[in-house]
Every structure is written in structure tokens, then in C-alpha cells.
A protein has these predicted regions:
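Outer-membrane beta-barrel porins/channels
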Residues: 1-258
Length: 258
């Protein structure tokens, strides 16, 4: 809101994201115990555009931000799996993501513009383009999971993950009312197959899946934590004559404070 109590409006859009290429290795150090590690190369580009204007006045301020991102991070983990009888197995794992860094090559342009009813922009004046380089931390993360099940019959398990900080601001995602805090998640789920080898009933060979999850995203908007929770249901539909499935999933959930 401006000094004369005129309400400003803002339009925002963005494009891009972060990609990952990875290489991993694992080794069984005991009959029931394995360890592994992988290295991830993260890369991508994110572009955002925002237009701030006063309604019914066909002029405003446009800001364009571009960030070219690249960097490495590492994961290490270990897994234990053992049979408690002829059919039932138990398993557990611990994974740790080592804190890494993303190097961001930033470009920022601020312009005065006019616009039409379709918000097509025409540049009137432009400030000097800003270019700089920043480093963004990829926070460390610890996750622990455990489960129990029978091969090709049923599995039930859960996972807990914790991260001290969910992220950092950069030019492309700066907002006055947005901050970042701790991340945490809890999930439970499993699957059930009535009869994997049934030749008489298709329904008995279907994989029935379900799960619950709760996630504290770490994103803070107007000092309110944004949480994500959901119920998931799914089916694995076997293709006759093959070892392949068609997987269908459904999710009912809530994200945010409303």
C-alpha cells in the first residue's frame, strides 16, 4: 500500500527448476548389512518475472531475475535386512545427506513499463543490469526408515526425516513475507497382494497400496509454518503375459494454513 493508501497489485510468474545427475555405489559388508554412497550433480536454471502496478493506471515496475545453478552434494547410507522366520523379513536404513553448495550466477533487470489489457509489456526505461554470483547452501538431511513384510505378499513401513534448515533465499525467490525454518516429515505406508501367482483371479494379483504422510515444509509465510499432509491410495495393475504393471495413484491432502 502506497503513502496515499492506494492499493498496489502484483503479477508473478516463473519457469525452470533444478535437475540432478547421480552416480552411486553399494557394498554388502555382512550377510544382512550393506552400505552405500552416491554423488549428485545438481544443475538448472530458474527465471522469474514480477510486475507491480496500480489498477487502472497502465504503467508499472517490472523485475526479471535469472539464476543459473550448479553444484555437488553427497549421500551416504546403510541398510540392515534379516528374516525373522521363513516368510517374514524386517529391514531398516539410515541415510545422511551431507551439506552441499549451489553456485548461482544471477542476472537482475528492473524496468519501468506500460502494459495493455492482456498485460503485454512495453519497456519505457531500464536500470543498469545487475550481475553477481552467490552461493546457496544445500542443507544436510537425516532420514531413518524401518519396515516389515513378506516378499510378493505385503509390506508395512515408516520413515522419519529431519533437516535443520529448508533452504535459502536467492534473487529469484525473495519475498518480504517469506522465510525458512526447520524441515521434518513422517510417513507410514505399505502394500498388499492377495495372491501374486493367481491364474484364476485378476483382482488377486493387483497390488493395493496406501499411506499417510505429514510434512513440515520449513517454508514460513507471514510467520506461519506451511505444512503438508495427505492420504495416498494406489493400485498396481498387472499386464497379462508380462512382468510389468500399470500404476495408478490417488492423493487427498491439505497444504498450508487454510
Amino acid at each position: 500500500i502506497s503513502a496515499d493508501n492506494t492499493q498496489n497489485s502484483r503479477r508473478f510468474n516463473g519457469d525452470g527448476g533444478l535437475n540432478k545427475a547421480f552416480l552411486g555405489v553399494g557394498y554388502k559388508i555382512a550377510p544382512n548389512f550393506s552400505v552405500g554412497a552416491d554423488v549428485n550433480y545438481n544443475f538448472g536454471k530458474i527465471e522469474t518475472n514480477s510486475l507491480e502496478f496500480i489498477p487502472n493506471i497502465s504503467a508499472g515496475t517490472s523485475e526479471f531475475n535469472s539464476a543459473d545453478l550448479s553444484g555437488l552434494n553427497f549421500n551416504v547410507g546403510m541398510m540392515y535386512q534379516a528374516k525373522i522366520n521363513k516368510k517374514i523379513s524386517v529391514f531398516s536404513s539410515v541415510n545422511y545427506t551431507v551439506q552441499g553448495n549451489l553456485r548461482s550466477q544471477n542476472i537482475r533487470n528492473v524496468t519501468t513499463v506500460t502494459y495493455d489489457s492482456n498485460f503485454n509489456l512495453q519497456i519505457v526505461d531500464q536500470l543498469e543490469e545487475q550481475r553477481n554470483q552467490t552461493d546457496i547452501k544445500l542443507p544436510s538431511r537425516l532420514s531413518v526408515s524401518a519396515g516389515i513384510g513378506e516378499s510378493k505378499k505385503w509390506v508395512f513401513g515408516g520413515k522419519i526425516a529431519y533437516q535443520k534448515n529448508s533452504g535459502q533465499q536467492n534473487y529469484y525467490n525473495i519475498a518480504d513475507n517469506v522465510g525458512y525454518g526447520r524441515y521434518g516429515s513422517v510417513s507410514l505406508g505399505g502394500y498388499y497382494i492377495p495372491n501374486y501367482n493367481s491364474f484364476t483371479s485378476y483382482a488377486k494379483r493387483i497390488v493395493y497400496r496406501g499411506g499417510l504422510r505429514y510434512e513440515k515444509t520449513g517454508l514460513m509465510v507471514n510467520s506461519q509454518s506451511i505444512n503438508d499432509m495427505g492420504l495416498t491410495l494406489g493400485l498396481g495393475l498387472p499386464l497379462n503375459g508380462t512382468f510389468s504393471n500399470i500404476n495408478i495413484g490417488f492423493e487427498l491432502g491439505k497444504k498450508g494454513t487454510t
